[in-house]
């Protein structure tokens, strides 16, 4: 099973970017987005999606459009979107 704490700690270096925009840090891309990618390629994509969505919802100032752009900004292909409004059942 996927531990949401892993997702939370992976996204931590990305919080300044997710709430403020600009450019994500190397830590955010290398540790954060890559960790989520590694988790989401398992058979537990729906669980990973729910963890990412829950983490996103903990930050009321998170900018959804910035969050959705994060994988592209880091040049990482993610199968699950980083968003507060993702329908994880559709994944």
UniProtKB/Swiss-Prot annotation:
Q: What are the annotated disulfide bridges? A: 4-51, 14-28, 29-74, 49-88
* Expression tissues: Detected in seeds (at protein level).
A single GO BP? lipid transport
What keywords were assigned to this record?
Answer: Disulfide bond, Lipid-binding, Transport
- GO molecular function: any one? lipid binding
Q: Does the keyword Transport apply?
A: yes
Q: Spell out the InterPro entries in the cross-references.
A: Bifun_inhib/LTP/seed_sf (IPR036312), Bifunc_inhib/LTP/seed_store (IPR016140), Plant_nsLTP (IPR000528)
Q: Which Pfam families match?
A: Tryp_alpha_amyl (PF00234)
Which protein family is named in the record?
Answer: Belongs to the plant LTP family.
Its annotated function is as follows:
Plant non-specific lipid-transfer proteins transfer phospholipids as well as galactolipids across membranes. May play a role in wax or cutin deposition in the cell walls of expanding epidermal cells and certain secretory tissues.
Name listed for the protein in its UniProt record:
Non-specific lipid-transfer protein 1
